[in-house]
Regions:
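A polyanion-binding, active-site-adjacent surface
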Residues: 2-127, 132-140, 150-153, 160-164, ...
Length: 187
């Protein structure tokens, strides 16, 4: 996604505090936060439905993409274009205004965090959730900084608030399914 929202940030802090109080160390607490606060509720349900619809689960030889959030969590790396929560006028930043590509502060943040993070991966499938994140990753790819990773552009944001999600998914599903099928998994 573009950035963690207020609710995700709040949930993450709560999970971190509980993890530490339960005796987990720093690394385990952070893993616990990531596992339990990534795409919760209907967003996770919608995401899994679309990923399974593209047969990602079959490509990964798992029963369902839902297991990426549980027993097969080691196959999944989640991140945001902007690593830290961003707010505009007291609300979650949606990525539309200002454009993160045209705003020098936001673009610098993306280059400092996301581009560096992407450089750690090679031949991985990157699934940008939503139009703005697709545009960001397309720009990073144009700049030659995507490191041979496969970009699954056209994937809609799984939020229930995205009323065009199903239509967008149907329009792009054959192209996305082909990319997944042709993807050479490099562990």
């Amino acid at each position: 996604g573009i950035t963690p929202g207020w609710q995700q940030m709040q949930d993450s802090f709560k999970i971190a505090i509980e993890s530490i109080h339960n005796g987990l160390g720093r690394e385990e607490s952070l893993k616990n936060v990531k596992k339990h606060s990534s795409f919760v509720g209907s967003m996770r349900t919608n995401l899994v439905e679309m990923l399974d619809g593209l047969k990602l689960n079959e490509k990964l030889k798992i029963q369902s993409s839902l297991s990426l959030f549980n027993e097969h969590n080691h196959l999944l790396h989640t991140t945001s274009a902007l690593r830290y929560p961003v707010f505009k006028d007291g609300k979650n930043y949606t990525g539309s205004s200002p454009s993160p590509i045209k705003n020098s502060f936001l673009w610098e943040e993306i280059n400092d965090s996301l581009v560096n993070e992407m450089s750690l991966f090679k031949s991985k499938l990157i699934i940008p959730l939503g139009k703005t994140v697709s545009e960001i990753l397309s720009q990073i790819k144009s700049d030659g900084k995507l490191n041979e990773n496969i970009l699954l552009d056209g994937f809609p944001h799984p939020s229930g608030a995205n009323g065009h999600r199903k239509k967008q998914f149907q329009m792009n599903s054959s192209n996305m399914a082909k990319k997944i099928k042709d993807w050479k998994i490099n562990n």
